[in-house]
Amino acid sequence: MRFFPPLEQGRLLRRYKRFLADIELTSGEQMTIHCPNTGSMLNCMREGGLVWFSRSNDPKRKLPGTWEISETPQGRLACVNTGRANALVEEALRAGTIAELAGFTALKREVAYGEEGSRIDFRLEFDGAPVYVEVKSVTLGYPDTAVAAFPDAVTQRGAKHLRELAKLARQGVRAVQLYCVNLTDVEAVRPAEEIDAAYAQALRAAVADGVEVLAYGTRLDAEGIVIDRRLPVLLNP
């Protein structure tokens, strides 16, 4: 995935009201941009740190800029636009990069399923047999470790998705939880039990019920993002 037009650079002044961020451009101009991330963005940003944003020419938009990449306190880069994860995964699926899911004959997005009113990110078909794939974007890193963690805030919705996947797996349907790690310098992923113990428990229960768990890392810079390698998932770090 290439950023076009190219991203612009600034420095973070503050993030507030969840969806807003004030930045200062290299010219010294200050502007408010949209923050497309509903999470806490823990360890994902710092005041004065570099940010990169895309700019829209749509006159109907109240805020023309969208925050895409952040410099973390550890000096990593994180793609904070969570909406990019599904597009990245679809790109990788169609390219055959995710070997465990290669060879599908059909792909549908945002398909309704389950007993709790969920929508699956991807429903693949392999010779008529469905495979359900739920995607989560991982951006939480810690100092002095190359292990990223998910989630960065309590997520009842994430636990619900795991329950739905587990129900499918118990019925003999292939179900996959896929973590798209949009953070540089990462070698593995784990559940963030210190933030959401219920989610970590739900993940381990889902695996016990037959849900497959995959994690893929990305190569990320201000020019683009691409999924490029599988990462281990540490269920009991």
UniProtKB/Swiss-Prot annotation:
It comes from the Bacteria. InterPro entries: SfsA, SfsA_C, SfsA_N. GO terms for molecular function: DNA binding. It holds the Pfam family SfsA. NCBIfam families: sfsA (TIGR00230). Belongs to the SfsA family. HAMAP family: SfsA. This is Sugar fermentation stimulation protein homolog. It comes from Pseudomonas putida (strain GB-1). The gene is sfsA.
